[in-house]
Amino acid sequence: MGGLASGGDVEPGLPVEVRGSNGAFYKGFVKDVHEDSVTIFFENNWQSERQIPFGDVRLPPPADYNKEITEGDEVEVYSRANEQEPCGWWLARVRMMKGDFYVIEYAACDATYNEIVTLERLRPVNPNPLATKGSFFKVTMAVPEDLREACSNENVHKEFKKALGANCIFLNITNSELFILSTTEAPVKRASLLGDMHFRSLRTKLLLMSRNEEATKHLETSKQLAAAFQEEFTVREDLMGLAIGTHGANIQQARKVPGVTAIELGEETCTFRIYGETPEACRQARSYLEFSEDSVQVPRNLVGKVIGKNGKVIQEIVDKSGVVRVRVEGDNDKKNPREEGMVPFIFVGTRENISNAQALLEYHLSYLQEVEQLRLERLQIDEQLRQIGLGFRPPGSGRGSGGSDKAGYSTDESSSSSLHATRTYGGSYGGRGRGRRTGGPAYGPSSDVSTASETESEKREEPNRAGPGDRDPPTRGEESRRRPTGGRGRGPPPAPRPTSRYNSSSISSVLKDPDSNPYSLLDTSEPEPPVDSEPGEPPPASARRRRSRRRRTDEDRTVMDGGLESDGPNMTENGLEDESRPQRRNRSRRRRNRGNRTDGSISGDRQPVTVADYISRAESQSRQRPPLERTKPSEDSLSGQKGDSVSKLPKGPSENGELSAPLELGSMVNGVS
């Protein structure tokens, strides 16, 4: 029991004996020292921690204290009053001794109580008196933050405690201070001298202990990895920075691969060792760390096209492949072996990235070589064409003005971009003339050119197939619409020519020449002879009416529009100027249905304005005005024959198209029975 009491290593605190209410002394530990009491906590916490006055506390007997026990001596017996209390030291007296057994009598009890005990439960009476204020001394030392965890273990203070001569050293967790308790004053003076040295040596010991623990773990890991899969490779010294990555990013990425257990790096030998559970995990981690350098030979004449404008092509290869960089070796750089006429392109990156870059570059080189072969074939074809006499037509020849510079085929000395496009020459030699090329976008026909060529051919064909009697003279509206103007018909319209011929002499002119063309009345404009022509010469063919190839719509003016719309004022039946009549809607079939129907149907015919309409209009005007005096004797008979039929006509032209009687009269005027 004495060793247990004196060894301050078992519990954090100064061991003492505390007197209970029954007079027995129980084992406790001093946790703190106050003015008139000490803070005690008991063994096994059978009682709560509390402050006890100095008069109820004493120190345990010294470890070397030994006294022979005889009959009649007072002793202390280690016993307990009941099962609920722990054992304590009770005062008793020896009544009888027989071998190793002692009969003792307790003195604390009122009634005499005897018990037989062995020698292990007996000890001489404790020679230490009850404690006083000067029985305990305490020293506190502030503990650095990095050493608080280490100071919580009392074993690290063993040498420090021995050097001080203190009874107990422990860390107070409440205020993170090191408590030094002693029963003498000497340790208090030594603590200020050895405190700093103790903390410094403690920090060094902790560092060494952590290294030893790390080495132990490494040893265990190495034993486990010896039976696992392993990958070992070496990286060039100048590429070690790329392999490690920024702040070790590549190594961290490799360690995150599932199945990788450890990665070792030999900085002196630039060697990586990868340990993993599977060979696939080791190879994947290796692909992140193994950086190297490789080159691709590029023909000298294709270097510019491989690099591209402003390095666009080679930059695309770098971005897609993932290599770190690419270097084009100059002629003065002889580090890497090169072939004759070739320029090395040196790529730096991982094995996989370099392989991707080589595949992209080789494909681009094959494409450039095929394009060059196609260009040479085209040059051979052009040379053969020159030899057989056709020759090579330069781009833009035969095109309209302003079109030769915008579209066309480039020559053999064109830029490399024009060589990528596929061109055809078939449309330049087998078309319908220089203005009808349809081979490609460079020779696309223009609508103005094609229309002009077709119109001129029709001009040359019209005099042969159309006579002077079976052509209809164009109306003023049609002639003004077909008269060539500047540009494409977007210029200012021609000056108007006021006329009202059909109001004054339309009837007389028809009666004078019944066999003439009645539709000539609708032409209200006089043809202008060209300036260079003689008065007696006929107008040139270009001034004749040309039939437009464009399909007419409802907005186009027709023969009736030209007859009803004149530039001058119209005369009404009263001889006064009136506004122009509303235009009738045009129908394209009216120009095709000029003849009279045999059945006399008017509703389904919808003919344009005929001569009979003008005759009817003139008769209605003659009722209000005196008749014309320009009639001849040869006209009287004709007028007499027609007077009866004219008198049966309505006063004005019908607006709903009922023109059956005028159609018959028109047939008689034209001389058709």
UniProtKB/Swiss-Prot annotation:
Keywords for this protein: Cytoplasm, Phosphoprotein, Repeat, RNA-binding, Synapse
Domain of life: Eukaryota
Comp. bias regions, Basic and acidic residues: 456-482, 620-635
A Pfam entry, by short name: KH_9
Positions of modified residues (Phosphothreonine): 411, 598
Compositional bias of kind Basic residues: 583-595
Modified residues (Phosphoserine): 192, 410, 450, 453, 533, 566, 580, 601, 603
Subunit structure, interactors included: Interacts with FMR1. Interacts with FXR1. Interacts with TDRD3. Interacts with HABP4. Interacts with CYFIP2 but not with CYFIP1. (Microbial infection) Interacts with Sindbis virus non-structural protein 3 (via C-terminus); this interaction inhibits the formation of host stress granules on viral mRNAs and the nsp3-FXR2 complexes bind viral RNAs and probably orchestrate the assembly of viral replication complexes.
Name used for this protein in its record: RNA-binding protein FXR2
Gene that produces this protein: FXR2
